[in-house]
C-alpha cells in the first residue's frame, strides 16, 4: 500500500489571464490523485468544515479516505500567482487554519504500508508520522520554501528520516 500524508487545501491561483478561487489543492491531494491511476492510495490529511462536498466526492472515488480528518474551522488555504511564462510562482498568502494544530494519526489499515510519501507539509508532523509505520520499504518527503524559511532545522531533521527528498522553490 502507498500512504500519502500532507496538505489538502483550497487554493486561489492567479495567472496572467485568470483567477481561480478556492479550487481543490494541496500537495497530498495532487499526489494521491496522481497515484490513484496505479494504486488505491491512503490519504492522511485534514480539512475544515468548509471543505466542499464536491471535492470530497472526487477524492473518494479513487482514494482511501480513512485518514482524512474533518475538523471545526477552515481548510488550509494557499494563494499564489504565476508570471506570463507560468514558470515562476509567487506565494501571496498561506493560511494554515486547521492544518496548524493537526495531530495526525495513521489508521490501522495504513500502518503496514510499504511506501510512504510525506508530501509538502509541516516537517515536525512528518517526522512524527513516519514513526507510526511498521515496515516501510521506501519513503520520500517533499518540501518548499515556506517550510525551509520557517522551520529550517526541522526540515533538515526530517530529511534524515526518509529515503529520498524532493525540494521545490
Residue map of PLM features:
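Extreme N-terminal starter segment of soluble prokaryotic enzymes
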Residues: 1-3
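Short beta-strand/turn micro-motifs composed of small residues
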Residues: 6, 45-47, 143
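Active-site metal-binding loops of divalent metal-dependent hydrolases
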Residues: 6-8, 27
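Histidine-anchored nucleotide/phosphate-binding helix
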Residues: 26-36, 130-131
